[in-house]
Structures are given as structure tokens and as C-alpha cells.
Amino acid sequence: MMRSLATAFAFATVIPTPGSATTPMGRGPMTALPVVGAALGALAAAIAWAGAQVFGPSSPLSGMLTVAVLLVVTRGLHIDGVADTADGLGCYGPPQRALAVMRDGSTGPFGVAAVVLVIALQGLAFATLTTVGIAGITLAVLSGRVTAVLVCRRSVPAAHGSTLGSRVAGTQPAPVVAAWLAVLLAVSVPAGPRPWQGPIAVLVAVTAGAALAAHCVHRFGGVTGDVLGSAIELSTTVSAVTLAGLARL
């Protein structure tokens, strides 16, 4: 378990972990990914809180600073998936053509627009959450990684030619998925001003990420690393935006 956790940290962050280089990303590290999400979420909440002290409550600068730190700590891994997936979904042609576009090193207009939208929405939502419930930032980041476990549940195929997809797609058994969803719902209860707001936010977020992944399976023939990254970022964004909106009620 510790080796899987170390691999998950090495894969999803810039943190070097002993022995992780010899363990490829697979079932165990994917199961442990929400633990990494919780750590990243705690870091994000701390940065947002510090930013609010410097720039003032609800300042967009504190939210954008938080997003910037997350991008650095994760090496921009997931946001790159947002760009590639958006470009793949935006192109015409069969799955092979879409996958080729995703593997291309350049970023098209769909990818640029998607990245800008995700960063802006996350930054503004994080800024709002610094005043209405900073724990919601941790919850949002965690929800993205739990969504990744859901996307890798049994019966979900990998797209043809995807190295990461072939290692993690279909690896997560139903009890593992259910356990992480239960944990997410449990910790979401105190994350908002009212106990019902957090659960609603994460349910909407996880559903959005799962729906995106399902569409990508239909469009590409399976999931890829880019699809996982885009599902993570979408769920994080939707969770933060939904909770920020509900907390204003």
C-alpha cells in the first residue's frame, strides 16, 4: 500500500518519493490517488487562506494564486489533459483521428478555450470559498481525484494505444469506488455553511466528470490519460463553483 501511495504522489505531483520509479501507475496507485487529492486540497486551502490575508477576502488574486500553485505542484498534468481532450472532442473524424489530434504536441483553439475557462472558474470559485467555507477548496480538489477512481471502474475500457489508459482503465472494483464515494460524501457534509450543500456539490461534480468520461469512451473508444486529467479538472471546477454558489444562498 505504501508503495502504491508513493507512486501516486510521484505520478500526480512534483514530490519525489523513494522507490516510486520502479512501480508503474496501475491499480494500486490509482486506488490511492484520492489520498494525494486530499493532500493537494489541504495545500490549496492553505494557499487560498494566506492569499486572502494578503489580498483581502474574496480577492480573485488569492484564487488565481491557489490555481497557480496547484498547476506547479501537479506539473500541469491534468490541465494538459483538459486541452488535449477538448481538441480531440472538437475534431471531426473517427476515433483514430481524434486520438491522433490528442497526441499532437500543439494545442488548438478548443484546448486553449477550455484551459482558460477551467483556470478562470477555479480561481474565482476558490476566491469565493475563502469567505464562505475554505474547506470547500479541499473538498473540490479531493472530488476530482475520487472521480478518477470512478472513471477507472471495472468495465471501462482503455482507448487504443493509450499507455496510461491501458494501465488504469477498468482496474477499480466496485467496493473501492463505493468506499471512496462514501468517504467523499461524508467529508462533504461539514464543508459548506449548511450540511446539505457539500454533498450536493460533490454529487454534481462527480456526475459531471463521469458523464464527460462516458462521452469520451463513446467518442474515442475508451479512456486515456488525457481523459482522466480532464475528468479530474472538470469535477474539481464543478465542485468548487457549485459549492461557492450554494454557499451564497
Swiss-Prot record:
For this protein, the parts annotated as crossing the membrane are: 32-52, 109-129, 132-152, 173-193, 198-218
- Its predominant location is membrane
Q: Topology in the membrane?
A: Multi-pass membrane protein
Q: Which GO terms describe its molecular function?
A: adenosylcobinamide-GDP ribazoletransferase activity; cobalamin 5'-phosphate synthase activity
* Cleavable signal peptide: none
Q: Where in the cell is it found?
A: Cell membrane
Which cellular component terms (GO) are annotated to the entry?
A: plasma membrane
Tell me which Pfam families the record gives: CobS (PF02654)
Give, as one word, the top-level EC class.
Answer: transferase
| Protein family according to the UniProt entry | Belongs to the CobS family.
What NCBIfam families does the annotation carry? PRK00235.2-1 (NF001279)
Protein name per the record: Adenosylcobinamide-GDP ribazoletransferase
